[in-house]
A protein has these predicted regions:
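Membrane-proximal helix-turn-helix segments that form the acceptor-binding/catalytic region
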Residues: 84, 97, 112-141
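Helix-loop-beta element that forms the nucleotide-linked donor phosphate-binding surface
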Residues: 132, 150-185
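Conserved nucleotide-sugar donor-binding subdomain of glycosyltransferases
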Residues: 8-59, 116-129
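Short, small-residue-biased leader/transition segments that mark boundaries at the very start
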Residues: 3-5
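Generic beta-sheet signal
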Residues: 92-93, 145, 167
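A short beta-strand/loop micro-motif in the catalytic core of glycosyltransferases
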Residues: 61, 139-146
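Short, solvent-exposed loop/turn segments at secondary-structure junctions
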Residues: 15-19, 66-68, 95-98, 148-150, ...
Length: 187
């Protein structure tokens, strides 16, 4: 007999933030002014959904800057929640940086979400580099998931003292094995 496998997919939605057709940039390739708020909403929404569904993750893998608020919430807002108490956080960095800093009020918006953290001062200027630096503070492991990662960010990752997986070509024969070994090393 054939086993029926079903995957469930959940969407975090908000008409104010996600009703537009473009994801991060407008038609002129400018970043939306509310990208910081959208990232904050997304992070909170994902974690509240995980709690509501009573999932207990072993590893939370965040991909690039837009999900970068998740590690901060896990370590500062949800740290005492039994669902997240033992979770390990992996952050993958890509070449998707932005030239202009996000909204200058981002630091205060994160603080208003219940994040009490002296390291928030890193986001006095919420540039791509500073956001990555802040996110890496709360990661248990870092992956350079692109050969086009910002060189400054890649160097910060290498000097972080955290377990690091350097860029792996998806065509490499040992691609999946290297990722599996990396996950095993942080658990």
């Amino acid at each position: 007999s054939e086993m029926c496998i079903r995957d469930r997919i959940y969407f975090i939605d908000n008409d104010d933030y996600f009703a537009r057709k473009a994801i991060l940039r407008d038609a002129d390739e400018s970043y939306f002014e509310d990208n910081d708020e959208r990232a904050i909403f997304f992070a909170r929404g994902v974690l509240e959904t995980v709690k509501k569904l009573r999932w207990t993750p072993t590893v939370v893998h965040c991909h690039d800057w837009f999900s970068g608020i998740v590690p901060i919430y896990l370590k500062k807002v949800f740290a005492d929640d039994p669902i997240f108490k033992e979770v390990k956080i992996v952050v993958s960095l890509y070449g998707d940086g932005f030239d202009k800093p996000l909204n200058a009020g981002m630091k205060e918006k994160i603080a208003n979400e219940g994040v009490k953290d002296k390291k928030l001062s890193i986001l006095d200027t919420p540039s791509y580099e500073n956001l990555c630096r802040y996110v890496m503070e709360y990661a248990d492991g870092i992956i350079l998931a692109s050969d086009a990662v910002n060189p400054e960010v890649a160097e910060l990752a290498r000097n972080s003292g955290k377990p690091l997986l350097e860029y792996q070509s998806p065509d490499a024969e040992d691609f999946f094995d290297n990722y599996n070994r990396f996950y095993d090393s942080i658990q």
